């Protein structure tokens, strides 16, 4: 049973006496200081997790009480999630961290139907929430008082005086010839109910971004996790589940030549994915995060309609803003191009939606109707195969009940009847020495050797192979 952590916030709001403060998100002129105080109410005998599945916060904004409901984002990581960095001698070092008890949440404000929230609870509360049509950010204050947080509107963050930042995709650039203009579409309400799709993301951080954050891999990792948490939330409107499959940090040197020319860098990254990356990681769409300043104020670029293509299912994004959400909007924008979307035009009646060509001063987390039409057409015309595969059963989390043939929260294996020799029936944990309990790539409690066929192809499709690192049968990245 999912436990609910009730947190009452004793809020003290102090008007700031001064010109501004500097936070990780930027310089602020107007903000509120809040002091959260946790009061936990768990049922008798319940075991408290480090990060609860559900949380509730009560506090005030502009003197008015609000109740923030949060639920852990269960779909954030793929079952075979890996983190990769490099040793000084260039060796690839891969880790498979346990991410079940992570600290990333989605939520809403009570009695506000249009509200949303994306919050990290890793080190205090950090993220954003939408309240009465306005976006607020919250983050810890780096003061001696560790409980102090700042709450502020996005519009109150001082903006740099620089030309508008924009996407580098030109209309019809590298698009499939059969992608139609939104004005030509006749999409019925039935079609608008998008079929469920699943995108496994690979994020690759270049050496420039690694240097930008002083070689602090932990800080970069948390930042990327927050980005994916935001992307996951934005893509729900399209009935797309986005999970992070691999995070690779180029800690020693760049593995491609990252140039100021966005088109050149994108071409090089796509070629590298096709020839190198797909041979060693399982993912559907790869993005390069870079600190490089591209020519022409460009902050991102991606092939239109490239999803599932070995060379074109890619995007490049500049880490252009201290606020995670703003960069996440750009990442979602570029992935939108891969899903067949063009930029919003005047007829779309939305100059601040995700697919706007120029980054808005008030970034939106919504897709326009034009974008939805483009996406529907892309699915109809091309039916990209790599995003059809549903998450493995370990992505399904519910109340732990032994023997229901699902891996539940806290279970390593299903310990129902008949008895699983790899599974301790008392704890639903793997027995000592066991790597797995079941799955197409599990045999006698061990992962099956890499390269073994685990799913035979149908028709003109391709066989799927075990990777030697997980019990699931990963989707062949070269599927059409």
Curated annotation (Swiss-Prot):
Q: Gene Ontology terms, cellular component aspect?
A: extracellular region; plasma membrane
Residues forming the Disintegrin domain are: 399-480
Q: Which intervals hold domain Peptidase M12B?
A: 197-391
- Provide a GO biological process annotation: proteolysis
Q: Does the keyword Nucleotide-binding apply?
A: no
Q: What is its main location?
A: secreted
Needed cofactors: Zn(2+)
Hey, what tissues is this thing expressed in?
Expressed by the venom gland.
Q: Which cysteines are joined by disulfide bonds?
A: 308-386, 348-370, 350-353, 413-428, 415-423, 422-445, 436-442, 441-466, 454-473
Binding-site residues for Zn(2+), renumbered to this chain: 333, 337, 343
- EC number(s) reported in the record: 3.4.24.-
Additional record remark: The disintegrin belongs to the medium disintegrin subfamily.
Describe the subunit structure.
Monomer.
UniProt-recorded name of the protein? Zinc metalloproteinase/disintegrin
Organism from which the protein derives = Craspedocephalus gramineus
Please spell out the taxonomic lineage of the organism that makes this protein: Eukaryota, Metazoa, Chordata, Craniata, Vertebrata
